[in-house]
Amino acid sequence: LICYNDHGYTGKTTETCENGETTCYEKSR
């Protein structure tokens, strides 16, 4: 997953997103 927060991309790719990272997208590639 690619983690995003209210400000945009967090720069992290993890299996789970932390609290406050409200939107997660599956990696497209």
Swiss-Prot record:
Functional summary from the UniProt entry: Binds to muscle nicotinic acetylcholine receptor (nAChR) and inhibit acetylcholine from binding to the receptor, thereby impairing neuromuscular transmission.
Expression by tissue: Expressed by the venom gland.
Keyword Disulfide bond included in the entry's annotation: yes
Compartment(s): Secreted
Any one GO molecular function term: ion channel regulator activity
SS bond partners: 3-24
Superkingdom classification of source: Eukaryota
GO CC entries: extracellular region
Keywords, alphabetical: Acetylcholine receptor inhibiting toxin, Disulfide bond, Ion channel impairing toxin, Neurotoxin, Postsynaptic neurotoxin, Secreted, Toxin
The name this protein goes by in its record: Frontoxin VI
Keyword Magnesium attributed: no
UniProt similarity note: Belongs to the three-finger toxin family. Short-chain subfamily. Type I alpha-neurotoxin sub-subfamily.
